[in-house]
Amino acid sequence: MMSSMALSSTSLCSSFISQHPKLSITASPPLFHTQTTKPISVKRKIITLAAPETLTAETVTGIDTSDNTPQQTIKVVKPDEKSRVVLKFVWMEKNIGLGLDQHVPGHGTIPLSPYFFWPRKDAWEELKSTLEAKPWISQKKMIILLNQATDIINLWQQSGGNLTSQ
């Protein structure tokens, strides 16, 4: 039995070797087309930069050329997030604390200053000197933060430390 299997496998191999394939050059379709073809579906990407408050869901319509039915896809357009400096405050009955944090997207917040308490010390002046010591904070951002601090201190003074009084 073993010898018959050996014979049949050798005869198979010899039959393959005895065949000589002929090379013929014929016109065949190219594997890669140099022309551009129509895409199966059209997808549109929308890139915008917006403030985080203006994030909205947006409807994008794609067209499928095979059956000509429109498809709707909902995408949320997100701006590239940058690190930002934020003003934090602690509202208390007898005083108010103001401090600076840096918010880094994906990493959380990093304190940039201790809390400065009003009216114990001039918190606004201490906040201003802290901002001026950070050269990477723009003049525009510094003015915005100091104006916010002024508004918060004025609101605290008007309410007498009571958050619920109007």
Curated annotation (Swiss-Prot):
One matching Pfam family, short form?
PSRP-3_Ycf65
Query: Domain of life of the organism in this record?
Result: Eukaryota
Which BP terms does GO give this entry? Answer: plastid translation
The subcellular localization recorded is: Plastid, Chloroplast
**Is Chloroplast one of the keywords?**
yes
Q: Which InterPro entries does the entry mention? A: PSRP-3/Ycf65_sf, Ribosomal_PSRP3/Ycf65
For molecular function, the Gene Ontology terms on record are: structural constituent of ribosome
GO CC entries:
chloroplast; chloroplast stroma; chloroplast thylakoid membrane; mitochondrion; ribonucleoprotein complex; ribosome; thylakoid
Question: Keywords for this entry?
Answer: Chloroplast, Plastid, Ribonucleoprotein, Ribosomal protein, Transit peptide
Q: What does this protein do?
A: Component of the chloroplast ribosome (chloro-ribosome), a dedicated translation machinery responsible for the synthesis of chloroplast genome-encoded proteins, including proteins of the transcription and translation machinery and components of the photosynthetic apparatus.
Q: PANTHER family under this entry?
A: 30S RIBOSOMAL PROTEIN 3, CHLOROPLASTIC (PTHR35108), SMALL RIBOSOMAL SUBUNIT PROTEIN CS23Z (PTHR35108:SF13)
Quaternary form?
Answer: Part of the 30S ribosomal subunit.
Similarity field? Belongs to the chloroplast-specific ribosomal protein cS23 family.
Protein name as annotated: Small ribosomal subunit protein cS23z
Q: What is the lineage of its organism?
A: Eukaryota, Viridiplantae, Streptophyta, Embryophyta, Tracheophyta
